[in-house]
Amino acid sequence: MTALPANTSTTEHTSGHLAGGVLGLPSVLFCIVTGAAPLAAMLFNVPVATLGGGYASPAAFIVATVALTIFSVGYIEMARRVTSAGGFYTFVSRGLGRVPGLGSGLLIAVCYVVFSAAVLGVMGYFAATTMASLTGIDLPAWVYMVIGLVLMSMFAYFHIEFTAKVLGVLLIGEVLVLLIMAIGIFAVGGAEGFSLAPLNPVNIFNNDAAIGVFGTGAAGIALFAAFWSWVGFEMAPNYAEETRDPHKIAKTATYGSVIGLGVFYVIISYAYVTGWGLTGSATAVQSQFAGDIASAFYPLTDRYVGSWATVLMEILIVTGSFACAMSFYNTSARYLFALGREGVLPGALARTSKRQSPAAASMTVTAIVALYCLAFVIYDPSTEGALLKLGTWSPLLGVLGILAVQALVSIAIIRYFLTSGKSDFHWWTTLVAPLIGFAAMAVACVLLVANRGDLSGAADAVYIEILPWVVLVVFLIGMAVAAYLRSSAPDRYARIGQFEMTEPADPGQQTEKTTGAQA
C-alpha cells in the first residue's frame, strides 16, 4: 500500500520515514535484548523471584518462557503483515480499532519513557557506588544520570546501526560475566550439589520451597519478577522499517530473544540457587534487601570465580544499565515518531535528522526523561533514592502498562485475522495461542497490582497506591483524543495506526491494505 501522508512540517532532512535496510538480524537482536538488560535482570529480578518462590525461582523463569513463547506465536503472525515503527500501537489499531489503538499507543509511549528514566536511575546508583568503591570518588547518582542522558541523546542522533553496535558490545560483556560465574559454580557443584527441585514449576507454589522473606511463599511475586525480566523483547516490530527483511527478521528476532533469554535466565537463576544452596539462596536475598550486601550475586562471584570477576560485574552493571536505558529511549522515540507522523501528536515529532533517525522525537524523550528524573531527585536526592525510588517504583508503572497492552494485542490479533477475510487464519497461531497469551498477560497484571506494595517496599507511598489508576487514565486519555479526532478532524483520525512501509521488504509477501478498522 502507499504510505498515508503525514501531517507534519518538514525540513530538508525530513521525510517522515526512518532509514530503511540498515539493520540486520544481529543489530535488531542487540537492540531488543539490551532492553531486557540480562545482567540487571538477573542481579535484581532473581532475588525478587526468590523472595516469593524461594529456591523454585528458576521454575518461575521456565513458566514465563513458555507463556511468552506462546504469546509470540500470534504476535509474529501480526508482525509479518503490519510493518511500522508503531509496534503495539499499530497492532491494536488494526485489530481493535483506532480509539483503543491510540489509547494503547499513548500508554506504551509513556511506559517506555518511564522505563528510560527508571533504568537511568539504576545506572546512576550503580555508577556512583562502583566509582566510590573502586576510586574513592564519591559523587551523587544524579551526576551520572545527567551524563548518561547526554550520551543517550548523542547516540540517538547518529545512525541506528551505530547505536546497535554500541549496544551489542555492552550486551556481550553482560552475558559473558554471568556465564563465567555459572561455569564456576557448576564446575564444583555449588554449595550442596545439584538438585532438580528448583526446576519443578509445582515448587513455585510449595510453601516448603518458599523460605524467603515472606515465609509462606508468594508465588505471584516469583512469577511477576520472571515476566519482568523480558520487558523489551517485543521491540522487534518497532525497528521493522529500518531492517533489511522486516518480515523474516521480526520473526527470528522475537523468537530468538524470548527463547534465548529464557534459556539464559533459567541457567543463571539455577546457578544462583545451586551456588548458595536451597536454603542459602533465600538467606542471601534477605541480606541483600536488608542492605548488608549490594547484591547476592557478588559474594557468589567472589567465591566461585574471584574478586576480579566481581569487579568486572560491578562495572558491567553500570554499562548494562546504560545500554538498557538507551534501548528503551530508542523505542520510546519511535513511538512518538509514529504518533507524530500520523498527525496524532504534533507533526514536528516526525522530523528526522539527515541520517534519518527520529531526531525530534528523541530530543522530546530527552526532555521528558530529564523532567521525570528531576522530580524524583527533588523528592529524594540521595544516591539510594535513585535505586529504591526512581529505579524501583517507576518500573512497576512501566511493566503494568506494557503487560496490559500485550493483553490487548492478543485480543487484537484474534479479531484482525477473524475479520480480515484472509485464508491464513489458523486455529493455533491466530486463535488459541493469542488466547493463552492474553490469559498469561492478564494474570501477570493482577499479580503486579496485588503485590505492588511488597515489590516496591513502599506500600503506603501515593505513587504506588495510584499506580493502576495512572495506567488507566493514560489509556483513557488516548482513547478520548481519538474520539475527539473522529468528530473534529476525520482526516487525522483516519491515519491512526494505518501507516505502513510503501513497499514490502519481501516480494513474496503482499503488504496488508488499510482495512479501515473502526472503533
Model-derived segments and their meaning:
Residues M1-V46, L51-A56, T69, V73, ...:
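Membrane-interface "cap" regions at the ends of multi-pass membrane proteins
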Residues T14-G21, P58, G136-P140, V169-E314:
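Helix-loop-helix junctions that connect adjacent transmembrane segments
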